[in-house]
Curated annotation (Swiss-Prot):
Stated family: Belongs to the universal ribosomal protein uL23 family.
Gene behind this protein: rpl23
Organism ancestry: Eukaryota, Viridiplantae, Chlorophyta, Ulvophyceae, OUU clade
GO cellular component: chloroplast; ribonucleoprotein complex; ribosome
The protein's name: Large ribosomal subunit protein uL23c
Annotated function: Binds to 23S rRNA.
Ribonucleoprotein in keyword set: yes
Keywords per UniProt: Chloroplast, Plastid, Ribonucleoprotein, Ribosomal protein, RNA-binding, rRNA-binding
InterPro entries per UniProt: Nucleotide-bd_a/b_plait_sf, Ribosomal_uL23-like, Ribosomal_uL23/eL15/eS24_sf
Subunit structure: Part of the 50S ribosomal subunit.
Cytoplasm listed as a keyword: no
GO BP: translation
A GO molecular-function descriptor: rRNA binding
Chain ranges passing through the membrane: none
Compartments where located: Plastid, Chloroplast
Length: 94
C-alpha cells in the first residue's frame, strides 16, 4: 500500500495549502480517487474530505541520440478534517 504513494510534494504552493488542511502527494497513475481516499484513510488513520487529482505532463529525456520520456505521474491534493494532521508534515515548521 505504501508503494502507491510515491512521496509528498514540497513546493511553495503545497506549503500554503497545508494551512487549509490540504496535503499534496505524488501517487501511482493507476489509482482512482476512491482508491486514493482508502489508501490515505488506512495508512494515516485520518478522515479524507476530498481528493483532487491531475496528471502532470511527461517531459522529454535525451540520452545520447535516443529520445525518450520521463514516466508520467499523478498528483493528488488531499483535504482532511480541521483537527487532523498527517505525521509526515508535523516537523515542517522548524
Amino acid at each position: 500500500m505504501i508503494d502507491l504513494v510515491k512521496y509528498p510534494v514540497s513546493t511553495e504552493k503545497s506549503y500554503r495549502l497545508i494551512e487549509k488542511n490540504q496535503y499534496t502527494f505524488d501517487v501511482d497513475v493507476r489509482l482512482t480517487k476512491p482508491q486514493i481516499r482508502k489508501v490515505f484513510e488506512n495508512l494515516f488513520d485520518i478522515k479524507v474530505l476530498a481528493v483532487n487529482t491531475h496528471l502532470l505532463p511527461t517531459k522529454k529525456k535525451r540520452l545520447g541520440l535516443n529520445l525518450g520520456f520521463k514516466t508520467r505521474y499523478k498528483r493528488a491534493i488531499i483535504t482532511i478534517k480541521a483537527n487532523q494532521t498527517i505525521p509526515i508534515f508535523e516537523n515542517s515548521d522548524s
